[in-house]
């Protein structure tokens, strides 16, 4: 495993796919990073030189919010929505779908399992 931006990425995969193992970087962003650092997208992580890995790491640290920072930012955004009392914040607080999906028959995952009483032995 190679470390890019403090995250272990698989060495046998091509660089863009390996970069997607970092939380906050998808395939499109990974391709942009490869083009910006002038690294062939078909190259595997194993074939990269140390300076290439350092170039990618520094580029990611400068341009993108990743991993723990990103998780913290998303959590703070949701918390602020709940504090100001907007509709999306209320939906988050109640544990319901936020983006307008129907809840009458769907949304089982977001609402959780229903708590039915279990009948005892008669």
UniProtKB/Swiss-Prot annotation:
Q: Can you supply a Gene Ontology BP term from the record?
A: translation
User: What protein name is recorded for this chain?
Assistant: Small ribosomal subunit protein uS13
Pfam families from the entry?
A: Ribosomal_S13
The record's region (Disordered) falls at 97-122
Any idea what job this protein has?
Located at the top of the head of the 30S subunit, it contacts several helices of the 16S rRNA. In the 70S ribosome it contacts the 23S rRNA (bridge B1a) and protein L5 of the 50S subunit (bridge B1b), connecting the 2 subunits; these bridges are implicated in subunit movement. Contacts the tRNAs in the A and P-sites.
Under Gene Ontology molecular function, one entry of this record is:
tRNA binding
Keyword Transcription included in the entry's annotation: no
The UniProt entry, under PANTHER family, shows: 30S RIBOSOMAL PROTEIN S13/40S RIBOSOMAL PROTEIN S18, SMALL RIBOSOMAL SUBUNIT PROTEIN US13M
GO cellular component term, pick one: cytosol
Has UniProt tagged this entry with the keyword tRNA-binding?
Answer: yes
**Subunit structure, interactors included:** Part of the 30S ribosomal subunit. Forms a loose heterodimer with protein S19. Forms two bridges to the 50S subunit in the 70S ribosome.
- Its domain of life reads Bacteria
Instruction: Read off the PROSITE patterns from this record.
Output: RIBOSOMAL_S13_1 (PS00646), RIBOSOMAL_S13_2 (PS50159)
Q: Which family does it belong to?
A: Belongs to the universal ribosomal protein uS13 family.
* SUPFAM superfamilies cross-referenced by the UniProt entry: S13-like H2TH domain (SSF46946)
Keyword list (alphabetical) reads: Ribonucleoprotein, Ribosomal protein, RNA-binding, rRNA-binding, tRNA-binding
